[in-house]
Amino acid sequence: MIWLRRVINLYNLVRTGWLLRGIPPSQAETVAQHTFLVAFTSLMISRDVISKGLSVDLGKVLSMALVHDIPEAVEGDIVKWVKDRVRGDVNKLDLEALSELGLNDLKDLMLELNSEGSVEALIVKICDNLATYIQGRVYYELGFKEVNDILEGSLSSINEYVRKLPKGYNEIVKNIVNKVIRSLS
């Protein structure tokens, strides 16, 4: 089990974007904490979509949510600014990192997620940004106003991914996300 010791390190790997905006390391969210919130919001949104009669593979959603940042056990936390500029290279690195961790069987899942090739992948992408937004709001309310650009960027990304969802899904997910965001006010 090559992956076990490396993946456990995600409990201690602080998300760099928060540090760059003045969040003290002792208060900064870790990759594992972020992953939990991504998985939980993915679960809740998927259940709501399913309850409206639309199809979502809940197992795939949860698997993608749990795996989406596993490569960071090898790569470290790569900030969005860098990812946006070297997207294709980061996607290749993600696959190499999974190999190094002995998790080759998760490569297809990562490819689908990174290509945004399904409703499930888009839900996880939305929830990845929603989890970042939720944590950013916590920091903002604690007085860390420097996180505002992350809040704005997360909302912009959420809206972009919602627009990519098929008709029917997009309105349901948009309404759920808006309820979550309003509940933070």
Show where each model-derived region lies:
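Alpha-helical, largely C-terminal catalytic domains
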Residues: M1-S185
